[in-house]
């Protein structure tokens, strides 16, 4: 039996992307993230700056928010992320934000090959959406480790481990980086 010492912890590597073939999906960062008690609140500052860089490179941004919040005060994207009116908000009723087909239609219509996944929780929406992106839709999935989070280190690291070992070649489509290590070839 192999001794298990813990999940793999991928080292972040620089990523250079063609903005014309790249999109960003922002998972479950809605108005509840204004509450400092919510773990997602920790992502507001770093992702706010990152999304400004993304927009300067003309990379499409798509927001997803859980269906339970649609039509409520928590149904809006978190204010610090400065969502533009041109950036769609989808309300899928699943952890996998590809459920229902809207996200895939937007991404394929934009000619997306590279999908940057940010948001919360790593062990829920990030894990399920990234898995579908790689395994089902065959996107190159870029996960900035400082652009996703979970309620505990264990949950975060376990989900990252799972993404790195996906079967059928899907794990090979995962690239782990940091927000400031992502460059766009302009």
What are these regions (language model features)?
Residues 2-23, 71-186:
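Active-site-adjacent betaalpha module
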Residues 30-36:
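Short acidic, Gly/Ser-rich segments with clustered Asp/Glu that frequently serve as metal-coordination loops
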Residues 37-54:
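…and closely analogous acidic/polar surface helices at protein-protein or active-site interfaces
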Residues 51-70:
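Von Willebrand factor
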